[in-house]
Amino acid sequence: MDMIGMASPAESPGGGGTARPSRYESQKRRDWQTFGQYLRNHRPPLELSRCSGAHVLEFLRYLDQFGKTKVHAHGCPFFGHPSPPAPCPCPLRQAWGSLDALVGRLRAAFEEHGGRPESNPFGARAVRLYLRDIRDTQSKARGIAYEKKRRKRAAASHTKQKQQQQQLVEQAAAAAEAHAAGCMMPLSVFN
């Protein structure tokens, strides 16, 4: 099997069970197939092993023509307005969030299909810079601020870990005091 080909059910994780793949996995498979088709239709045809960040950028620009997000040009009277009151001739583009998610899925698919992380064209610096530029441009043109989402769950687990560490420190201090005083402390203190 080449890196673009799909694994047979026997090769896939789980051994071909009846469980349906998640929405993310299905989308990742479709994205990978679309990118493989793009490589095959490229003139001259392009092998994945020779694919670079520049080819990924070419693919993202190709996808831009199928976008559904209105991105106002600098000369448009609605530039910077999130909800324009009337239609305008500005082009439809791929939204930054869609491109960012697509690159993330393709980056994962590349490595799942045998690619080395250090040679992953979807993680190239040029691709990251392109996505950042698209985000900034669309943010200004559409009047929408893109802010990084914070992980609430991670913060809650971090607080819990801190509390557990503090309890262990207090228990160790109590054990040291008891030992210094010469009395016995039950082992249940450490559970």
Curated annotation (Swiss-Prot):
Pfam families (alphabetical): ALOG_dom (PF04852)
Role: Probable transcription regulator that acts as a developmental regulator by promoting cell growth in response to light.
PROSITE patterns: ALOG (PS51697)
Cell compartments where the protein resides: Nucleus
Locus of motif Nuclear localization signal: 148-152
Keyword hit for Coiled coil: yes
Coiled-coil spans in chain: 152-179
Keyword line: Coiled coil, Developmental protein, DNA-binding, Nucleus, Transcription, Transcription regulation
One GO cellular component term: nucleus
Gene Ontology MF terms: DNA binding
PANTHER family: PROTEIN G1-LIKE1, PROTEIN G1-LIKE2
Keyword field contains Nucleus: yes
Domain of life: Eukaryota
Domain (ALOG) ranges: 23-150
Classification via InterPro entries: ALOG, ALOG_dom
Residue ranges, annotated region (Disordered): 1-29
The name this protein goes by in its record: Protein G1-like1
Family: Belongs to the plant homeotic and developmental regulators ALOG protein family.
GO BP annotation list: mRNA transcription; post-embryonic plant morphogenesis; response to light stimulus
